[in-house]
C-alpha cells in the first residue's frame, strides 16, 4: 500500500477529529456540521477499504500534524492563506431535507464517476425540482455534497451522492450523473427543473424554461443507459 495514501488518511482522520471538537462546542455553522457528517461517512469507507483502524489512524495523524506545526512559521501560514482561494458553500437544501430518510418503490441505481445515482422508477407524471448542496471554487461547482430530487409536495424521489470509498469527482462527473438522473425520471413523463444554483455553477448557463441545458437527444441517451445498465 502506498505510504502517501496511508499518511493522507491519517491526517484526514485527525483533522476530522479537530472539526468534531469544534462542533461539540457549538463553534460552527450548519454547513460545517453538514460537511462533518458527510466526511465521517467518507472516512469510514476509506478506512474499510484500506483496512485501517480509525482510532489508530487519528493518533498517527496527530503526530504528523504536530511535527509539521513545530516547523511552521507564521510567515509561511500567511503566504499559504494568501495564495489559496477559499471555496464557497452553496446550500439549496436545509439540514432536514439533506438528512431525511427516503424510500423507493421501484429502486434503480447506477455508479458513475465516484457518484451514486439513485431514483424511484415508480414516480410518474410529477413536477420535480433538483436541489443540491455543494462547494464552489472559481465560480464553478467543485465538490458535490448531495443532490436530491423533490416533488411539489416535498417527497424525495431521487438522489446523487459521493461514494465514500471512492476518490473525488469532477464537475463533469456531476453533470453526467445529473444527466442520468434526468433521463431516468423523464422516461416516466416527469417534468424536471434544476435549481438556479445548479444551473449557474454546474452548467454556467440557464435556458428559457429554467431547466438544465441538456439536449433532448442526450436525455434520451441517458435514459436508455439507465434502462440497460442499472
Curated annotation (Swiss-Prot):
<keyword id="KW-1262">Eukaryotic host gene expression shutoff by virus</keyword>
<dbReference type="InterPro" id="IPR009068">
    <property type="entry name" value="uS15_NS1_RNA-bd_sf"/>
</dbReference>
<feature type="region of interest" description="CPSF4-binding">
    <location>
        <begin position="180"/>
        <end position="215"/>
    </location>
</feature>
<dbReference type="GO" id="GO:0039540">
    <property type="term" value="P:symbiont-mediated suppression of host cytoplasmic pattern recognition receptor signaling pathway via inhibition of RIG-I activity"/>
</dbReference>
<dbReference type="GO" id="GO:0039580">
    <property type="term" value="P:symbiont-mediated suppression of host PKR/eIFalpha signaling"/>
</dbReference>
<keyword id="KW-1114">Inhibition of host interferon signaling pathway by virus</keyword>
<keyword id="KW-1102">Inhibition of host PKR by virus</keyword>
<keyword id="KW-0899">Viral immunoevasion</keyword>
<dbReference type="GO" id="GO:0039657">
    <property type="term" value="P:symbiont-mediated suppression of host gene expression"/>
</dbReference>
<feature type="short sequence motif" description="Nuclear localization signal">
    <location>
        <begin position="34"/>
        <end position="38"/>
    </location>
</feature>
<dbReference type="GO" id="GO:0003723">
    <property type="term" value="F:RNA binding"/>
</dbReference>
<feature type="region of interest" description="PABPN1-binding">
    <location>
        <begin position="223"/>
        <end position="230"/>
    </location>
</feature>
<dbReference type="GO" id="GO:0039502">
    <property type="term" value="P:symbiont-mediated suppression of host type I interferon-mediated signaling pathway"/>
</dbReference>
<keyword id="KW-1090">Inhibition of host innate immune response by virus</keyword>
<dbReference type="InterPro" id="IPR004208">
    <property type="entry name" value="NS1"/>
</dbReference>
<keyword id="KW-1088">Inhibition of host RIG-I by virus</keyword>
<keyword id="KW-0922">Interferon antiviral system evasion</keyword>
<keyword id="KW-0945">Host-virus interaction</keyword>
<feature type="short sequence motif" description="Nuclear export signal">
    <location>
        <begin position="137"/>
        <end position="146"/>
    </location>
</feature>
<feature type="region of interest" description="Disordered">
    <location>
        <begin position="208"/>
        <end position="230"/>
    </location>
</feature>
<keyword id="KW-1048">Host nucleus</keyword>
<dbReference type="GO" id="GO:0030430">
    <property type="term" value="C:host cell cytoplasm"/>
</dbReference>
<dbReference type="InterPro" id="IPR038064">
    <property type="entry name" value="NS1A_effect_dom-like_sf"/>
</dbReference>
<feature type="region of interest" description="RNA-binding and homodimerization">
    <location>
        <begin position="1"/>
        <end position="73"/>
    </location>
</feature>
<comment type="similarity">
    <text>Belongs to the influenza A viruses NS1 family.</text>
</comment>
<keyword id="KW-0694">RNA-binding</keyword>
<dbReference type="InterPro" id="IPR000256">
    <property type="entry name" value="NS1A"/>
</dbReference>
<keyword id="KW-1113">Inhibition of host RLR pathway by virus</keyword>
<comment type="subunit">
    <text>Homodimer. Interacts with host TRIM25 (via coiled coil); this interaction specifically inhibits TRIM25 multimerization and TRIM25-mediated RIGI CARD ubiquitination. Interacts with human EIF2AK2/PKR, CPSF4, IVNS1ABP and PABPN1.</text>
</comment>
<dbReference type="Pfam" id="PF00600">
    <property type="entry name" value="Flu_NS1"/>
</dbReference>
<dbReference type="GO" id="GO:0039524">
    <property type="term" value="P:symbiont-mediated suppression of host mRNA processing"/>
</dbReference>
<keyword id="KW-1190">Host gene expression shutoff by virus</keyword>
<dbReference type="GO" id="GO:0042025">
    <property type="term" value="C:host cell nucleus"/>
</dbReference>
<keyword id="KW-1192">Host mRNA suppression by virus</keyword>
<comment type="function">
    <text>Inhibits post-transcriptional processing of cellular pre-mRNA, by binding and inhibiting two cellular proteins that are required for the 3'-end processing of cellular pre-mRNAs: the 30 kDa cleavage and polyadenylation specificity factor/CPSF4 and the poly(A)-binding protein 2/PABPN1. In turn, unprocessed 3' end pre-mRNAs accumulate in the host nucleus and are no longer exported to the cytoplasm. Cellular protein synthesis is thereby shut off very early after virus infection.</text>
</comment>
<keyword id="KW-0832">Ubl conjugation</keyword>
<dbReference type="GO" id="GO:0030291">
    <property type="term" value="F:protein serine/threonine kinase inhibitor activity"/>
</dbReference>
<keyword id="KW-1103">Inhibition of host pre-mRNA processing by virus</keyword>
<protein>
    <recommendedName>
        <fullName>Non-structural protein 1</fullName>
    </recommendedName>
</protein>
<keyword id="KW-1035">Host cytoplasm</keyword>
Amino acid at each position: 500500500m502506498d505510504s502517501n495514501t496511508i499518511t493522507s488518511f491519517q491526517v484526514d482522520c485527525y483533522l476530522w477529529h479537530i472539526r468534531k471538537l469544534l462542533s461539540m462546542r457549538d463553534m460552527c455553522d450548519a454547513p460545517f456540521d453538514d460537511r462533518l457528517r458527510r466526511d465521517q461517512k467518507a472516512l469510514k469507507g476509506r478506512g474499510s477499504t484500506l483496512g485501517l483502524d480509525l482510532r489508530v489512524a487519528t493518533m498517527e495523524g496527530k503526530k504528523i500534524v504536530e511535527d509539521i506545526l513545530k516547523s511552521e512559521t507564521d510567515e509561511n501560514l500567511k503566504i499559504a492563506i494568501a495564495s489559496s482561494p477559499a471555496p464557497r458553500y452553496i446550500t439549496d437544501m436545509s439540514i432536514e431535507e439533506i438528512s431525511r430518510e427516503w424510500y423507493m418503490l421501484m429502486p434503480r441505481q447506477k455508479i458513475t464517476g465516484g457518484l451514486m445515482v439513485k431514483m424511484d422508477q415508480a414516480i410518474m407524471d410529477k413536477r420535480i425540482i433538483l436541489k443540491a448542496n455543494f462547494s464552489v471554487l472559481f465560480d464553478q461547482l467543485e465538490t458535490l455534497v448531495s443532490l436530491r430530487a423533490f416533488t411539489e409536495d416535498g417527497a424525495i424521489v431521487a438522489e446523487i451522492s459521493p461514494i465514500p470509498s471512492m476518490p473525488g469527482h469532477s464537475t463533469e462527473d456531476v453533470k453526467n450523473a445529473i444527466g442520468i438522473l434526468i433521463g431516468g425520471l423523464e422516461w416516466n413523463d416527469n417534468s424536471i427543473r434544476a435549481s438556479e444554483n445548479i444551473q449557474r455553477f454546474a452548467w454556467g448557463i440557464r435556458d428559457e424554461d429554467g431547466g438544465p441545458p441538456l439536449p433532448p437527444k442526450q436525455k434520451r441517451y441517458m435514459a436508455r443507459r439507465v434502462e440497460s445498465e442499472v
